Amino acid sequence: MKKLNYEVLNESEYKGYVLGKGKAPVKVLQFGEGNFLRAFVDYWFDMSNEKAGWNGKVALVQPIAQGLTKVINEQEGLYTLYLRGAENGEKVNRKRVISVVDGCYNPYDQADWDRIKAIAKSDDLEYVASNTTEAGIVYDPDSSFDQL
């Protein structure tokens, strides 16, 4: 089975909404790349692109050394979200390709760390999201934005 990426998606004749690679600026810096953030928070940003023309991408930051950067980037940030449950009293069982993720970055890699800092300083940045545990965030009173 082929891994999902933009080329495979185009070949599949997928009919849903897709924001192409490099088609929007990174507007969200998200600390955490786990299932909850990608299935909930990133879903809403993806829907904002489709329904409201928000035109933004999300940069993910893995909070610990052993994260999902490689897996996410191999799929160019694309993944399939299964939506199951009830909506307006009706059973829902559908799939949506989420295309809002620009990429995933490993802060333990110097090149990725430099990219994370550049995103943090970008005028395009509108939101910072986080759902990491104490394993992923450490308070440093000596740290300041000027150090970026």
PLM regions with names:
Residues 1-148:
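Non-transmembrane, aqueous-exposed alpha-helical and coiled segments at domain scale
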